[in-house]
Amino acid sequence: MARIAGVNIPDNKHAVISLTYIFGIGRTTAKKILDTVGIAPTTKISQLDDAQLDAIRAEVGNYMTEGDLRREVSMNIKRLVDLGCYRGIRHRRNLPVRGQNTKNNARTRKGPIRSIKR
């Protein structure tokens, strides 16, 4: 297993799929990285030599991934909560943030139904 950006990448999968195991890299970004490095997306990670893996590591280093990206996302949410804006209040109350209806659905975000005690 190759290790890129602190993540173990599976050897038996295509390079474009293996790179998506890194938080912050999806299919499109993985294809861009492989095009920049000059590796075919259908190449398996086990077929790459160390120089090619180092080139991929260097290119992935140009993107914000894993811990840095997670930290930035959580800081953005914390900033909204501290501001007390509408989106921050929705985050604080664990309700949908992007305008979805909550009268009938939104069970994933709201959690299990709490019964009313009489």
Curated annotation (Swiss-Prot):
GO terms for cellular component: cytosol; small ribosomal subunit. SUPFAM superfamilies: S13-like H2TH domain. Residues 106-118 have a biased composition (Basic residues). One of its GO terms (biological process) is translation. GO terms for molecular function: rRNA binding; structural constituent of ribosome; tRNA binding. PROSITE patterns: RIBOSOMAL_S13_1, RIBOSOMAL_S13_2. The keyword tRNA-binding applies. Keywords: Ribonucleoprotein, Ribosomal protein, RNA-binding, rRNA-binding, tRNA-binding. InterPro entries: Rbsml_uS13_C, Ribosomal_uS13, Ribosomal_uS13-like_H2TH, Ribosomal_uS13_bac-type, Ribosomal_uS13_CS. Gene3D superfamilies: 1.10.8.50, 30s ribosomal protein s13, domain 2 (4.10.910.10). The keyword tRNA-binding applies. Residues 94-118 are annotated as: Disordered. Part of the 30S ribosomal subunit. Forms a loose heterodimer with protein S19. Forms two bridges to the 50S subunit in the 70S ribosome. Located at the top of the head of the 30S subunit, it contacts several helices of the 16S rRNA. In the 70S ribosome it contacts the 23S rRNA (bridge B1a) and protein L5 of the 50S subunit (bridge B1b), connecting the 2 subunits; these bridges are implicated in subunit movement. Contacts the tRNAs in the A and P-sites. Belongs to the universal ribosomal protein uS13 family. This is Small ribosomal subunit protein uS13. It comes from Psychrobacter sp. (strain PRwf-1). The gene is rpsM.
